[in-house]
Structures are given as structure tokens and as C-alpha cells.
């Protein structure tokens, strides 16, 4: 069951896209960098990588073991495919968080030109 705390956490989550990075507050940028660093640590974790590969191999083995074409067999195929898509989506979200962190760091390191009047670069 969803609790009010869970709903509030979902509604106040930080959503980031490339168009809003330049307009974000410093606290939000720090949060993006923190989440990106955590995601990067997870992606570099060898145990997690081995677990994910083993999990996917087990799912593929169970998928190849389904030989029938009944409605129940088709439902099993769909369920296993959804599990594979879910784990791939999880890894993609980690990679996206790392990319956003790197993008924020790059934008913060770029020097801003000090232009006066109508100077042209």
C-alpha cells in the first residue's frame, strides 16, 4: 500500500533533463551530482554487474525452456520479457544519472565570457 510519505517523495523527486540543467538551483545541481556519483559507484560495482548478468542468463534460460504455445506459456514469456526490460531499464537509469552528473560538472567548469555591451565572440 502506498503511504503518504511515499507519495510525497514521488511528487517532490528531482527530474532532470538537458533543457533544465542551466536553470537549476545550486542545491539541485548538488543533488544531481550526488545521485550521479552513487549511480556511478553502482555501475562500477563488480558484484552488481555479475549479479545482473547472472540474473539475465537465468531469465533467458527460463525463457528458452518454454516450449509450448498455450496461453499460460505466452503469459510466462511476457512476464520474463518484462523482467528483462525492467533490469535493462534499471541499468539505463543508472547510466542516465551518470551522464547527467557529467554534464552538470562539464557545464560548471566552462568559463563564462565577460561580455560588455555588444561585443562579439
Label each residue range with its predicted role.
Residues 2-121:
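Intrinsic-disorder/low-complexity detector
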Amino acid at each position: 500500500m502506498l503511504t503518504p510519505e511515499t507519495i510525497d517523495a514521488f511528487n517532490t523527486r528531482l527530474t532532470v533533463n538537458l533543457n533544465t540543467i542551466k536553470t537549476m538551483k545550486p542545491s539541485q545541481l548538488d543533488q544531481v551530482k550526488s545521485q550521479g556519483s552513487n549511480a556511478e559507484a553502482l555501475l562500477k560495482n563488480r558484484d552488481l554487474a555479475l549479479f545482473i548478468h547472472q540474473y539475465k542468463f537465468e531469465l533467458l534460460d527460463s525463457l528458452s525452456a518454454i516450449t509450448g504455445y498455450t496461453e499460460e506459456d505466452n503469459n510466462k514469456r511476457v512476464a520474463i520479457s518484462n523482467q528483462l526490460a525492467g533490469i535493462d531499464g534499471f541499468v539505463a537509469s543508472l547510466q542516465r544519472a551518470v551522464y547527467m552528473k557529467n554534464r552538470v560538472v562539464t557545464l560548471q567548469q566552462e568559463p563564462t565570457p565577460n561580455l560588455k555591451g555588444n561585443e562579439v565572440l
